[in-house]
Amino acid sequence: MTANNENVKTSESASFESAGPNESEKPIRFASATLGAKRHVCAFFNSPDEEYRVLLPFIKEGFERGEKAFHIVNPALRKEHLRRLESVGIDTDAAEKDGQLALRNWEDAYLREGRFDQDKMLALIEEVLDEGKQQGFPLTRLVAHMEWALEDRPGVNDLDRKSVV
């Protein structure tokens, strides 16, 4: 997950949507913090090992609670991401089959039609969150790898102009 910038190796964004009032009251742990009612985290990591040391407990907790997981990953690291999830006891095959785990590559999320379009990305997130509710999951945890934003990609400068989430 090494990006072009030597000081920023990996970045993640995590957001959540609850399906019911009781779910929004449950504490959610991320690293050494408890997240409040409005939950969004942007984290930068120095290495993949550091990234997964922080993310895996957070991800596993969601699976144990029966929450949906939506992960956007570097396509070159998809298999490694699944291996890391499996290393903490998550049955990724079963989770994908029953809809608890949904994985998308950058090109199928951030970079649809070959460029970043913030409005389309936000529409996708809304769609995924609504889908999680319709499937009966109490909460959807979104983990999104953002290293692509450090590359020269069409639309990447729109991240600087617009600030949403």
Model-inferred region functions:
Residues 81-125:
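Long, charge-dense
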Residues 164-165:
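Conserved small/polar residues in nucleotide/adenosyl-binding loops
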Residues 48-50, 78-79, 109-112, 131, ...:
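Short acidic, S/G/P-rich loop/turn micro-motifs used as interaction or catalytic elements
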Residues 37-77, 81:
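Glycine-rich P-loop/Walker A and Walker A-like loops and their local beta1-loop-alpha1 context
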Residues 29-37, 71, 88-102, 133:
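Flexible, compositionally biased loop and terminal segments
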Residues 48-52, 118-122, 159:
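A conditional alpha-helix N-cap/helix-loop micro-motif detector
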Residues 120-123, 127, 135-149:
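Elongated alpha-helical scaffolds
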Residues 1-12, 17-35:
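Short, compositionally biased "basic patch" segments
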